[in-house]
Amino acid sequence: MAQMEVSYSRRLDYQYMMIETDEEARSDYRLSMLINNRINGFLPVHVQQMNGKSTLSYEITSLENLPEFLDARKITYDEMVSLLLQFCSAVSEVGRYLLDGEGILLEPQYIYVSKSLERIRFCYYPYQHMPLHQSVNVL
């Protein structure tokens, strides 16, 4: 996986998780798919390039990452089932856009949920090259 540096930013009423990578955003179909489509279950993303590096900005407005959410309260069995179903749906959804599961960041700090847990959003990072089954083990 490419070296990545994560930071957070607030602009007006929006919040972003920004991942700076040493990969230059080249004409990569995966990146184009992410930028030009709203993929259900995934954080919207914008890309900025400067000095041979790329910054992917993921909108996280009104969401909190999974560890923060779980620190604040426990989830029920039904909520856990809902999270797992949404994960399965997201994996299926990336296939519709010719993306593979390797780009889904499954580390808990990159998984975002709404305050009511009605929706879960994953981060798709096109420069990750870890098979999905290995990423699930990390989770």
What feature does the model see in each segment?
Residues A2-L84:
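Conserved structural core of kinase catalytic domains
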Residues Q48-Q49, G95-Y97:
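Short, charge-rich binding segments
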Residues T55-S57, Y112, R121:
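General beta-strand recognition
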Residues D78-R96:
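Conserved alphaE helix
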Residues M80, I104, I120:
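Conserved activation segment
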Residues I104, Q109-I111:
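Hydrophobic residue at the +6 position relative to the catalytic HRD Asp in the kinase catalytic loop
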Residues S114-L139:
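C-lobe/activation-segment region of protein kinase-like
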